[in-house]
Design a protein with these regions (language model features):
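Juxtamembrane transmembrane-helix boundary signature
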Residues: 53-86, 95-103, 107-110, 440-447
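C-terminal membrane-solvent junction of multi-pass transporters and transport-like membrane proteins
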Residues: 7, 359-438, 445
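Membrane-water interface regions at transmembrane-helix termini and the short interhelical loops
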Residues: 39-43, 69, 85, 93, ...
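Transmembrane alpha-helical segments of multi-pass small-molecule transport proteins
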Residues: 56, 95, 123-150, 164-175, ...
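Membrane-interface "cap" regions at the ends of multi-pass membrane proteins
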Residues: 1-47, 61, 197-204, 222-232, ...
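Extracellular loop-to-transmembrane helix junctions
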Residues: 38-69, 90-95, 241, 246, ...
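Hydrophobic alpha-helical segments and their helix-loop junctions in multi-pass secondary transporters
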Residues: 110, 115-118, 164-190, 206-211, ...
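Hydrophobic, small-residue-rich membrane helices and short re-entrant helix-turn-helix hairpins
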Residues: 9, 13-17, 150-163, 212-247, ...
Length: 450
């Protein structure tokens, strides 16, 4: 869709609820769901607590479902809608962060996919070296870049097929994990603290799933057939992401009983491979690498939409070239120079999660409080008279800052990250709560629409 258009033309609104479901199902059926499950157990939780954390974390997809429903109702993509909550210029900072999030996720997934293809080559007795790594990067990165040439309808069809193929194969792998899991050890796990264990576990899962995907939700919802019931858009988006995420996290929780290093290792895919019989090695690496492609498709598409929404107006071929270069150059640095990329994965999720949790909380509060009867089209145009919506901006700054002040990790030590906030991701949860509280205050000073 061209940035000259605020609303998606009706001729392009071709997505059905089913296609929406498979789009999000495909994006969340990847092997990384097992790793999230192991990360939950790493917070020293019992089996019941871990399953509760996984369920609530997966239900963070209620946020993308809601955003997608707004996108369908208005026919407008995510960060164009966000202009109403922040103002045309005030929206640029969260918009840039969203673009950065998509680009970083894209780079991480391309790097991961490349390494998985290299591992696949090794399983079929092709020597691992610089050449095979380069071939794998060109192949995987090339697939992602080529997806930028396709229409939304074509991408939706591809996502549907990928859902079936990798969904079935992932279930096979899940069954093998469940058969091998130590169920007695799982049920014997001691209970952890509900505040310092369960809540941070929920926060880190939500940051890496529902909160992150909220930015792309209306980018797909805006293309849904206008005759579709809003509830269908909401539930197909929510369940499409939540169901596979929960099932895979449950598998990861059980897998951690036989592979306790899964949550902390620098090579989680290698650890999972070691837990499987050798005969399924080729299928496993195909599923692990192929399962990342749907995520890359969504990230690549939304990154290009967000770049245009920021105000950087380039032609479609130029946008494709810019993002294609990023997809290739960052992995080249990591794969051939730096040599390490997963060590700061949780830190990456935590930082972006704080910024995005407050953004989506304010976006949804603004929609409920001030846009219940629809958005004023003038507020989301590039020439909008409202340059800065200070209610939304100040709420976001205060909420995000509060989240950082109560967060600590290997590279940041917030001054108030003590007690229950020490060494966990409660800052993500706190930033969303503070954002909602701030918007309630804003509402008392506002009447009607902002």
């Amino acid at each position: 869709m061209q940035d000259d258009f605020i609303k998606v033309p009706n001729s392009e609104k071709t997505l059905t609820p089913g296609k929406l479901f498979y789009n999000w199902f495909a994006a969340n059926i990847g092997i990384m769901g097992f790793v999230f499950g192991a990360m939950i157990v790493n917070y020293h939780l019992s089996f019941t607590q871990s399953m509760i954390a996984a369920l609530i974390g997966a239900l963070s997809f209620l946020a993308p479902g809601w955003v997608a429903m707004i996108g369908q109702r208005e026919g407008i993509t995510t960060f164009k809608l966000s202009r109403a909550a922040y103002g045309i210029y005030g929206n640029k900072i969260p918009n840039v962060i969203a673009w950065l999030n998509m680009v970083c996720w894209l780079a991480v997934n391309v790097i991961t996919g490349t390494l998985l293809l290299v591992s696949l080559f090794n399983v079929i007795h092709v020597e691992k070296n610089t050449v095979t790594k380069a071939i794998a990067l060109i192949f995987f990165g090339g697939l992602v870049i080529c997806s930028g040439l396709l229409t939304e309808n074509t991408l939706a069809k591809i996502q549907t097929w990928l859902s079936y193929i990798f969904g079935i194969l992932t279930i096979v792998i899940l069954i093998l994990f469940l058969v091998k899991a130590d169920w007695h050890a799982a049920f014997a796990l001691p209970s952890g603290n509900w505040i310092t264990g369960v809540l941070p576990a929920i926060s880190i899962v939500a940051a890496g799933s529902g909160i992150s995907w909220s930015m792309a939700a209306a980018d797909w919802g805006a293309y849904v057939n206008p005759q579709t019931r809003p509830a269908a858009t909401f539930w197909n988006t929510t369940l499409g992401g939540a169901v596979p995420m929960f099932v895979l996290m449950a598998g990861g929780i059980l897998l951690s009983t036989i592979e306790p290093s899964l949550a902390t290792t620098g090579d989680p895919f290698g650890v999972m491979y070691a837990a499987l019989p050798s005969w399924i090695g080729v299928i496993y690496f195909l599923v692990a690498a192929g399962g990342l492609i749907p995520q890359c498709i969504i990230s690549f598409r939304s990154a290009r939409i967000n770049l245009a929404t920021i105000g950087i107006h380039v032609s479609q071929p130029t946008s494709l070239l810019i993002h294609g270069a990023i997809v290739i150059l960052i992995p080249i640095y990591v794969l051939f120079i730096s040599g390490n990329f997963l060590s700061n994965f949780e830190i990456f999720l935590n930082f972006l999660g704080i910024c995005l949790a407050s953004w989506v909380a304010i976006f949804l509060c603004d929609s409920i409080m001030f846009r219940r009867h629809g958005y004023n089209i003038q507020l989301v145009k590039q020439d909008s008279p409202v340059h800065y919506n200070f209610g939304g901006i100040l709420s976001w700054i205060l909420a995000t800052t509060t989240g950082f002040l109560f967060t600590n990790n290997a590279i940041w030590n917030g001054p108030f990250a003590h007690g229950i906030f020490r060494n966990n991701s409660l800052g993500v949860f706190l930033s969303a709560v503070v954002a909602i509280f701030c918007m309630l205050i804003v509402k008392t000073f506002k009447r009607g629409r902002i």
